[in-house]
Structure formats: C-alpha cells, structure tokens
Amino acid sequence: MTQKRLFGTDGIRGTANTAPMTAEIALRVGQAAGLLFTRGDHRHRVIIGKDTRLSGYMIEPALTAGFIGAGMDVTLVGPLPTPAIAMLTRSLRADLGVMISASHNPYEDNGIKLFGPDGEKLSDATEMEIERLLHADLSGQLAAPAALGRAARLEDAAGRYIESAKSTFPKSQRLDGLKIVLDCANGAAYRVAPTVLWELGATVIPLGVSPDGFNINSGCGSTAPDYLCAQVVKHGADLGIALDGDADRLLVSDERGHLVDGDQIIALIARSWSASGRLRGDGVVATVMSNLGLERFLKANGLILDRTRVGDRYVAEQMRATGRNIGGEQSGHVILSDYATTGDGLIAALQILSVLVEEGRPASETCRVFAPLPQKLKNVRYHRDNPLLHPRVKQAIADAESGLNGHGRLLIRRSGTEPLIRVMAEAEDETTVIRIVDELCDIIAVSAESETQVHLS
C-alpha cells in the first residue's frame, strides 16, 4: 500500500454506521492496531476515551473487542477531551491511546484517533501499517484464549486530567474576580473544563454542558462562535471561551463580543513567553492558513513563522523537529509542547487567562496582538471526483493568482476530514479578496455539479 485509504489528516472519520465508521471496521482497527503495538513481554494496555456522540456507544465496544482479541488490556475512561487521552496514555505507560471523536463535526459523524505511547499522533507510516494489517487475514495472529486482554474503567480519569490542566497555570495567580463564559459544545469537556476554571477561582457561566448524544457542536462551541460572543456581552463577562466537540481547539471572545482566532492566540502566547524567556527556538509553527499579519508581527519581534501543511499533527511534527514549543492553527488548535503533545483548548485558555491576570487590561486590548490582513475562507462541498482537476477550475485558479500579482496569497485545497474544497484568499484589499474567493467558489461548485451529473447519467 503506497497511500492511506482510511486515515485522513486526523485519523479515521465518517458517518456513523456507514463505512468506514462501522462496528465491523472499528473491530478490525482494534485488532490491527493491537497486534502492531503488542511488542515485548509486558502486559499491553490501550486507553480508550470518547466524546458525547450517540455512536460512541457502538464504536467503543467494537474497538474494545478488537484490542482484547489482540491480547491488549483496555482501560476505558469515558467522555474526556482528546488531549486528556494523550496525557493519560503517557501517564499510565500505555502502549496506545484511542479517542473516539469527529471533533467539530456534527453528531452524525464519528472518528477514531490513535496516539502512540509517547502521546503523539501516529506517523503516516504507522497508520499505513495498520491499514495493511486491517485488510490482511489476522486469524492466525490473534491472542490465544488464555492470552486475551481484559477491560476495566478508570474511575478517576477526569480528576487526573483536571489536576494536570491546573498545573499549567502559574501557582502565584488566581482567577478571582474574572467572569468567564465557557462553551463546551455539549462535547467531551462538559464536565472537566468548568471544574478547572471554577477551582482556580473564576466565576463560570457554563454553556453547552448538557450533552444528549445528538447536540454536540449543534449551534454551540467553536464552530458557532456568534453564540459565545452574544453571551459574553449579555452577561458582562471578561472573556468567552469556546471549545469544540473534543476540546482540542478553542476560540475566544473579548468582553465586547469580538472574536479572537487561533492566530491571535498564538501571537499572544508567543509574545508573553518570549518576554519571559520561555519561548524555545526562533519562532512558532503554524500552517499555510495562518494570516500574513501573524507572520509580520513575529518578524517585527525577531521571530519567524514556520509554516506547515494543514493539520495539527504536521504542526506537532515540525515543532518536534525544530525544538519549538508553540504551534497551532488559525482554526484554534494551539499546541504548547511544554504541557501537551497535541492541541489542548483548555490549557491554551489558561495561558490566555494568565496573561490577562498579569497585565490587568481588558481582553479587547490584550488579545488584539496584530492587525490581520483581509482574508476570506469559503468551503465548497463536492460528491464524487475532485473538482480541482477540472480544466476550467485550473484556469480560474491561475487567473486569480495572476490577478494578485504577488501582493497576496491564494490557497485552495481539499479538506482531509470532509468532502469539501477550501478556498482561501488574502490580500491588502478586502474587496479583491471577497471577489476572488466568491468567483472561484462559484466555478468550483459548477464543476463539482457537472461531474456529479456525468456520473448519474
């Protein structure tokens, strides 16, 4: 196998009870990953967590059966943030960690994310090997009856993560006097995130903390930030924090109800850590989606912006390769490798709050670190073939790049997690940005529709 079929940029993802997100495939994933990670003579263990989707009740036991059949003991921790699973995998010296989540997607979708014993997302090569085993005949490799694994629940898993998150906040600081609106997206952090802020002294106004299996990311969380911004203004809060369904990313609202994206958060933390001597390396790592304003701000402060392809796993890989300890995405994935191996929305929020406490200024001043260039991102859904291969689309892209004449950026790519074409343009002139994105999206949409009609005819 020369390329991955099941694994995208963030694990395996799809519509629940439809391939590849079926109980049968989840069972095979458990068997394949279990066989790959049962090396050595010690008892082997996998940590399995999930978010609050209804389909988690289907995927969790299927994975559990697969791992047990491969001879691995399974530790079930229930609904917890993705970064908590990475942390527990390291802390409990497990061989593997698994998070059942489709992150910011609606409840109909689900996914499987895998972490190695170091708490890092698996490499492309390892994922390819799991896919190879998944399609192989494993009947002669599974555990003998006496070597089957066992399953048990870790009752204090939430408490362990709560204490781990709190330990990243300066012991000399408290959140007394701060009113914070916290939107947990009816997702994995609905219990732990409010507890952390409350125990540190904040007055917490919790939103999205009543999951029912269907309402994850539904009109709430980081995918619906307007709700957060409105609630911040309504309650006269000092700050608003919105997490996504698995709490590995965040967006923030200042006290005026203005949104603060991942680029501003990265700049804020980088400025603070650079001033205190905590910033490692000569800059930060972000993706090609990050605003040129962030790059200019860092350059003005003697730092560089090291760009990677889209996906927090690629940001993390580049951080490890370069020794940098801050990285992230405009979408709100913020990786602080001093504390976590993956994006952690709650830990990033605590760093923002630490700066607010230290500076004593309102969030509208503290969190507006640089002036972003006009930028527009728009998605076009497609159903079958890649519309970017259509000659008319290729010509339109070439014309748009020529029109920018080196005074802006154009980025067009397929999503690694959904059947979407993402179109982003950035330039000094907002009117130009809007026109280019809208025109390209119209052409891509027409091409995608024509391809569908060809296949249906």
From Swiss-Prot:
SUPFAM superfamilies: Phosphoglucomutase, C-terminal domain, Phosphoglucomutase, first 3 domains. Activated by phosphorylation. Its cofactor is Mg(2+). The modification Phosphoserine is found at residue 103. Its EC number is 5.4.2.10. GO terms for molecular function: magnesium ion binding; phosphoglucosamine mutase activity; phosphomannomutase activity. GO terms for cellular component: cytosol. Keywords: Isomerase, Magnesium, Metal-binding, Phosphoprotein. Gene3D superfamilies: Alpha-D-Glucose-1,6-Bisphosphate, subunit A, domain 3 (3.40.120.10), Alpha-D-phosphohexomutase, C-terminal domain (3.30.310.50). Binds 1 Mg(2+) ion per subunit. It catalyses: alpha-D-glucosamine 1-phosphate = D-glucosamine 6-phosphate. One of its GO terms (biological process) is carbohydrate metabolic process. Signal peptide: none annotated. The active site is at residue 103. Mg(2+) binds at residues 103, 244, 246, 248. Belongs to the phosphohexose mutase family. PANTHER family: PHOSPHOGLUCOMUTASE (ALPHA-D-GLUCOSE-1,6-BISPHOSPHATE-DEPENDENT) (PTHR42946:SF1), PHOSPHOHEXOSE MUTASE (PTHR42946). Catalyzes the conversion of glucosamine-6-phosphate to glucosamine-1-phosphate. This is Phosphoglucosamine mutase. It comes from Granulibacter bethesdensis (strain ATCC BAA-1260 / CGDNIH1). The gene is glmM.
